[in-house]
Curated annotation (Swiss-Prot):
Localization per Swiss-Prot or TrEMBL: Cytoplasm
Gene3D superfamilies, alphabetized: 2.30.30.30, Nucleic acid-binding proteins (2.40.50.140)
GO biological process: peptide biosynthetic process
Name this protein carries in UniProt: Elongation factor P
Similarity comment: family membership: Belongs to the elongation factor P family.
NCBIfam families in the cross-refs: efp (TIGR00038), PRK00529.1 (NF001810)
Originating species: Serratia proteamaculans (strain 568)
Biological classification of the source: Bacteria, Pseudomonadati, Pseudomonadota, Gammaproteobacteria, Enterobacterales
């Protein structure tokens, strides 16, 4: 794998640091008036999702991580693992529940997700940016009830709870942004 100098750090670059893969989120190169130049880096630990701030000297370097983002289709959950399949090779991967974490509430059958593989092992799952799901439970919207914020909680067929406008009813299909968890529109 390639070696990257701290001068080459860019957002999106995946490196090995302390034996684990990290994704660089931001990098600021600083040249003080006195002393050696350095890079102030914010990065995310891919195995846990935690964020780390680290300062690298200009002479430091890190090896590139052998991490691959792959589009895969979500198949099913057997209670212990979430199963994904590569659409071209039909290779299947079982992903542990702790790895899927918050993405689980957005998963629908055959949804195309981005699965991050490290040494052939799934370490992260990113759901599609937008999903269309049916509303299974919400309060009825009463005519003239517009005082307040103008929204009500609704449970989707995936199990996620989102805030929707008062006019949305049970059985309607809505479009939701999975990155923010916000209602986008009704689907006709």
């Amino acid at each position: 794998m390639a070696t990257y100098s701290s001068n080459d750090f860019r957002p999106g670059l995946k490196i090995m640091f302390e034996g684990e893969p990290y994704a660089i989120e931001s990098s600021e190169f600083v040249k003080p008036g006195k002393g050696q130049a350095f890079a102030r880096v914010k990065m995310r630990r891919l195995l846990t999702g935690s964020r780390v701030e680290k300062t690298f000297k200009s002479t430091d370097s890190c090896e590139g991580a052998d991490v691959v983002d792959t589009n895969m289709n979500y198949l099913y959950n057997d209670g212990e693992f979430y199963h994904f399949m590569h659409p071209e090779t039909f290779e299947q991967h079982g992903v542990e529940e702790k790895t899927v974490s918050d993405a689980a509430k957005w998963l629908q059958d055959n949804a195309e997700c981005i699965v991050t593989l490290w040494d052939g092992r799934p370490i992260a799952v990113q759901p599609p940016n937008f999903i269309e799901a049916e509303i299974t439970d919400t309060d009825p919207g009463l005519k003239g009830d517009t005082a307040g914020t103008g929204g009500k909680p609704a449970t989707l067929s995936t199990g996620a709870v989102v805030k929707v406008p008062l006019f949305v009813q049970i059985g309607e299909v809505v479009r939701v942004d999975t990155r923010s968890g916000e209602y986008v529109s009704r689907v006709k």
